[in-house]
Amino acid sequence: MAAGMKGKRSRRRKERKNVEHGCAHIKSTFNNSIVTITDSVGNTLSWASAGGLGFRGSRKSTPFAAQMAAETAAKTAMEHGLKSIEVYVKGPGSGREAAIRSLQAAGLEVTLIKDVTPIPHNGCRPPKRRRV
């Protein structure tokens, strides 16, 4: 190892992309919410999840956790110059509407909201019903 580089990791500085329009992909499951903001091609600008923000257990699946995840992802994406987004929502979770409202409140102009939840043509057998 070089004498001056001992104990230091070389880390590339994150480059600031200049993107005006992008896409927000919200995946809201029964257990978690993940918000990924990409440019129009599909390259990720920022992402955040409810679990990554410190929400654990049943608090991870709340609308408030999804709202915080969307806010965090939006702030990071707006540093890249993002102004307007198309929103693609996937999954049956409770954080869908909260995440969309949070993106609008963060100052992003929402141009499209589309539900892209995959629906099986009678594929896999669903999990058994819970008896509480």
Swiss-Prot record:
Family: Belongs to the universal ribosomal protein uS11 family.
Molecular functions (GO terms): rRNA binding; structural constituent of ribosome
Composition-biased stretches (Basic residues): 1-16
Subunit structure: Part of the 30S ribosomal subunit. Interacts with proteins S7 and S18. Binds to IF-3.
Gene: rpsK
Protein's UniProt name: Small ribosomal subunit protein uS11
Domain of life: Bacteria
BP-aspect Gene Ontology terms: translation
HAMAP family xrefs: Ribosomal_uS11
